[in-house]
Regions:
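N-terminal basic, low-complexity leaders that serve as flexible interaction/assembly modules and, when applicable
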Residues: 1-87, 326-339
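Generic secondary-structure transition motif, activating predominantly at the C-termini of alpha-helices
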Residues: 9-13, 33-40, 108, 164, ...
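Short, flexible, mixed-charge acidic loops at enzyme active sites
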Residues: 32-34, 83-96, 147-160
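Short, basic, glycine/proline-bearing loop/turn elements
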Residues: 34-46, 101-111, 252
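Intrinsic-disorder/low-complexity, polar/charged segments
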Residues: 41, 48, 97-101, 156, ...
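Glycine-rich, proline-tolerant flexible connector loops at the mouths of alpha/beta enzymes
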Residues: 69-89, 97-99, 105-111, 194-213, ...
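A gly/proline- and charged-residue-enriched helix-loop-helix capping module
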Residues: 90-127, 132
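Active-site loop segments of alpha/beta catalytic cores
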Residues: 114-339
Length: 339
């Protein structure tokens, strides 16, 4: 386990720490914009291995990050299960809402079997990625369920909230299905070459504590337990965004190797609260990266100084903003390397 990221995930306080960024492949890179123009349909782009491989590798070539994360989308799995999915400019993903037992029963099982193009991408990246570790990923079952029930991202998620409170049995049946499908999807990525896998629960912060434990922590812990049995040497990371006061409990109970943390949390303080050895990943504010200059330098140094001597992966609290100058990302890479 010589790759820096994998050593940190194994509990080693690697220094300087490994660094990669959420959305490190994306619209802030001119080479990505040029590539993206070749396939305007986003699902087609993600499921064309030649394009997805290139998108995955672009930030590795430019910045020599310690990890490459598969270029894909958290909604590819429900799409492969039969959900309608379209990406509209200015709106993001739009799906046909799933709000009754008949809609859940209409899903086709074994969605991972229809995502062979994603596995081709994983295998091809693994052959070319060099010293960077390759991270596969999926959406957390709760976050995927949010999109399926609501049909799109909404400010207050009214349909989702009504369903999970008024018909919890139905909502849990959807979560159970997504949990099973996610295990199979991540296992397929591992078998194709992923060296670590990550769950993105972008909407975990919507829930009160009791439902967070039931609908976020529970499914993640179940996925973690299954993966530890089938692939014990492959670490799992999880990003329960905006979980805040529940992060220490999540780290203790989810069984993951690392918890990724958003920018609203004092990362060194969280590290002191942990009851079990878990690597922490994060959590520079993406707006500090966008600003560059003194803001970037100061915030990066505060984070690095606070996490020295701990298992730590330097990342952002969320994805790279599209307007971020690539020169700022290059400077951040230098700051971490010089820590």
């Amino acid at each position: 386990m010589s790759k820096k990221l994998l050593r940190a995930l194994g509990g080693e306080a690697v220094w300087p720490p490994p660094v990669w960024l959420m959305r490190q492949a994306g619209r802030y890179l001119p080479e990505y914009r040029e590539l993206r123009a070749k396939a305007p349909d986003f699902v087609a782009f993600c499921t064309t291995p030649q394009l997805a491989v290139e998108a995955t590798l672009q930030p590795i070539r430019r910045f020599a990050f310690d990890a490459a994360i598969l270029f894909a989308d958290i909604l590819l799995l429900p799409w492969a299960m039969g959900a309608s999915l379209a990406y509209r400019e200015g709106e993001g993903p739009v799906l046909s809402p799933v709000r009754d037992a008949e809609a859940i029963a209409a899903f086709r099982p074994r969605g991972a079997e229809r995502l062979g193009a994603v596995m081709e991408t994983v295998a091809a990246v693994k052959r070319q990625v060099g010293e960077a570790a390759l991270i596969g990923f999926a959406g957390g079952p709760f976050t995927v369920a949010c999109y399926l029930v609501e049909g799109r991202a909404e400010r207050d998620w009214p349909a989702l909230r009504r369903l999970l409170w008024e018909d919890p049995a139905l909502f849990e049946s959807l979560l159970d299905l997504l949990t099973e499908e996610t295990v199979s999807y991540l296992e397929a990525q591992i078998e194709a070459g992923a060296e670590a896998v990550m769950l993105f629960d972008s909407w975990a912060g919507l829930l009160p504590a009791s439902r967070f434990r039931r609908y976020v922590l529970g499914p993640v812990a179940a996925i973690s337990a299954r993966l530890r049995r089938s692939h014990p040497d492959v670490p799992l990371l999880a990003f329960p965004r905006a979980a805040n006061a529940l992060l220490a409990e999540f780290a203790a109970g989810a069984g993951v190797a690392a918890v990724s943390v958003d920018s609203g949390v004092d990362l060194p303080a969280l590290a002191r609260q942990l009851s079990r050895p878990v690597a922490l990943q994060g959590n520079l504010d993406p707006w500090a990266l966008l600003a560059g200059g003194t803001a970037l330098e100061d915030e990066a140094k505060i984070l690095l100084e606070g996490m020295r001597g701990r298992p730590f992966i330097f990342n952002l609290g969320h994805g790279v903003l599209p307007a971020t100058p690539p020169a700022h990302v290059a400077r951040l890479r230098e700051l971490v390397a010089a820590a």
